[in-house]
Every structure is written in structure tokens, then in C-alpha cells.
Amino acid sequence: MKLKDKVILIINFVTVLFSIFTFIGYLNNLIGFRVVTISLCITIAMTVYLLYKKRKGFLLVYLVYLFLTNFGVFVTNIFLANPLVEYHGDLSWYYINTSNLFSIATFAILTFTILSNFISVFSKETPSIKFDIKSKGNNLFYYTGILFIIGFTIQFLFYILTGRLAIKTYGDYVSSIQELPMYSYGIFFFSIGIAFAFSNVKKTHIKYLVIILTPQVLLFLMTGNRGEVFYPVLSALGVLIVRNYKIKWWMIITFVFTLFFVIPFIKVFRNMDSSSIEKIDINWFSSLVEIGYTLRPLGYVTRWIDGGESIVYGKSYLAPIQNMFSYIIPGLQPVNYEMVGYGFRYRLPGMGFNVIAEAYYNGAIVGVLIVMVLLVLLLWRFTNFKSFEMLSMSTAIVSVLINNIRNAFSFVPVYILIIIAIVIILLFIDSYIKKEMKAD
């Protein structure tokens, strides 16, 4: 091991250890949240660098998004006494329960970070050399991915041009997609397309994928809908890191500039009339707090549990599986989400949900520990598949798991099952094509 690598490992170990001690100090009222937050930010940065060097791309992108969505408000709170200054309505979920929220979110992210570091340092498995970005993967998966991307583009433009999808404001956009059930499946296949394409693309062809994706990305950003961009793009970034793609500094700067300036500008500009353009006021923390607002469901969940509601011991994770089997097993009744405590979309309409909140609702702090450990092990396993076909499947599933960070688990099993079915079909087609080519 080179001296530089040894120094990085030592620094990383020290930052992780310091974060653990500061968190323990916070739990014992010896240290303030600002010290813990700053310490955790440094630890996350060092862990991300280590994961990048070790090509653990899926762990890296999941950790980054998990941190942003659950710590965006706390990071802003370091600089502002009122991080939710741009928000109105009932904010008691944060201000009444801040300490508890901070403790749970810190525990979850610190658990994920510690285990990611442990695996990166002690795991001897590395991504296969044939995955290198200079090599091209499976052609059928690659072109299927492009087909899915183009197919969604056509669907998206059709909905806009026919007036069925309103994009004037984000509110109009959200309202109109409720009336378009096929739109959500289009988004899903769009994310699969990105996963398949980037898992198999050769370095010299990445620019063509960027050109194909640009129209959809711009339209999503203009509507204020960043989720449909972040989920698949983060999974694509993850697989590129697994495939040893070198991230340039200008890419990081462009991402930060887009996140903190371009997107807030679009958001403000789209909600203003021409007479008030000179009054545009963009706050640096707007995007950070908006992403971090995913913390809100955790605030409600802790309130439910503290109010005497019982934890459900994994029932919200088993419910979607039960619903799938209810179609094929006679007498097995599907779960009616409107009648159970874990019908989150009915209890908190329009909020999405939170992966940490759901884990806490199922098993309190032990549930959070179990879910974080399982996620790390799963994402690590996905990194170590030995074929482009399995890598494609892994990347698509990672996109679903990233989506789950800001949503309930209820959709995850069905989406994963669809991905597996598509992969199996493509494997049969690919095998048939290769046999025919050999016969000729």
C-alpha cells in the first residue's frame, strides 16, 4: 500500500472515531449539535473519497443522497437559527422534536458510514477488470436502455403537447401526473434505461448518452421535479465509479453550482411575473433545505411512537410482498393501506416518506440499525457481480433503492420483480441471438 493511501486510511479512521465520540457526547448533553454536524460532514467527505478510490460506487451515491436528504436542514441550522425560514404551516415536527430527530438521523448515517468504511478497508473483492469504462458491455442491454430512454421521451413530450401534463408550475405538474397512471411506469422504465445504458456504455460513447438525456433532464428541472433526475442519474454515477470512470473537478463544481444556484433560480423565476424580475432573491440554502425536508416524515413518525403507537415489527416491509402473493394464493387477502398504521401515503398525503422513518416505525432504533446494515451489505454485493448483465440489473435496483430514500417501501418489491423479469427476458433473447450467430 502506498504511503498516500495509508495516510488517507488513518485520517479516515480518525474522523470516524471523532464522529462517534462527538455523537456520544451529544447524547450525554456534553457537546452541541453543531460540532457533531461538522464532524459528520468531514467524516462523510472522507468516506466518499475512500469509496471512490475503492470503486464502491453504489455505496458512495447512496450515502451522499441519504446524507443530503436527512441532514440538509441540520447543516443549514449551523449557519441559520431558523433553517425553515422559507417554509410556512405546521413546523412543529422539527422544532418540538429537533434533538430526537437529530439523534436518529445521525445514528442511521453514522451506522451506514462506519460499515461502508469497514467493508472498503477489509473487503478483498474488487470490481472485475472487464467492467472498466474503456470496455463495452452487452449490446442488447445497452440498446434496450437507449430504447427505454427514447420511449419515455416520446411519452413525456406527447403528454405535454396534448395538454395532459401541465408544466407551468410544479403544483400543476404534480396535480396532472395524478391523472396519468402510465406516467409513473414511464419514469420507472426511464430509470431502467439509464441504468442499462450506463452499465454497458463505452467511455467514448458517453457523450451520446448525455445528448439523448439532456432534453428530459432540462424539462424535469424546469418543472421543479428533481427526483426523476436524481434517482437514475445517481445510479448511473454509481455504476460509472464501479467501472473506474474518473470524476473530474469541473464535474463536481458543475453539480454544486447547479444544485445551489441554477435550480433555486429556476424555482424562483418560474413563480414570478415579468414585473418583479429585479426582485429575484436566491438563497444559497434553498436547495439544501428542500432536499433535507425529506426529514419531515421522521418527525411525524417519532411523534406517533412517542404518543403510544406501537412499532409494527417489519409489517410495512412484508405488506407489499403479501399483496403480490394475494393474486396467486387463494384466500390470502391483500393489505388495505387505508386501514393500517403503515399506510403512510394516506396518513401523510403528498409528503412522500423517508427510509429512516420507516425503519424506525418498524423497530425503533434497532430497526434503523438493521435496515442500514442490510442496505450496506446489499449495495456492496451489487458492486461485486462478475457480468455486465448482472451489473445492469444491480444498477437498476440501486435506482429503486435511492428512490426509496424519499418514499415508502411499498413500491420496491414490485419494481425489483419487474427489473428481474426484464433481465431474464433479455438474457433469453441474447442467448438466442448468439446461438443464431454461431449457427450462421
Where are these regions (language model features)?
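N-terminal "leader" segments that precede or initiate the main folded domain
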Residues: 1-122, 213-216, 232-262, 410-428, ...
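Membrane-embedded catalytic interface detector for glycan/lipid assembly enzymes
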Residues: 27-34, 84-95, 116-243, 260-274, ...
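Hydrophobic, aromatic-rich transmembrane alpha-helices
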Residues: 43-49, 190-201, 370-384, 436-437
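Hydrophobic alpha-helical membrane-insertion segments
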Residues: 57-73, 144-155, 256-265, 314, ...
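Hydrophobic alpha-helical transmembrane segments
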Residues: 99-112, 179-191, 209-211, 230, 252-254, 296-303, 369-370, ...
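Small-residue-enriched transmembrane helix-hairpin modules in multi-pass membrane proteins
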Residues: 170-177, 262-376
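Hydrophobic alpha-helical segments
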Residues: 348-440
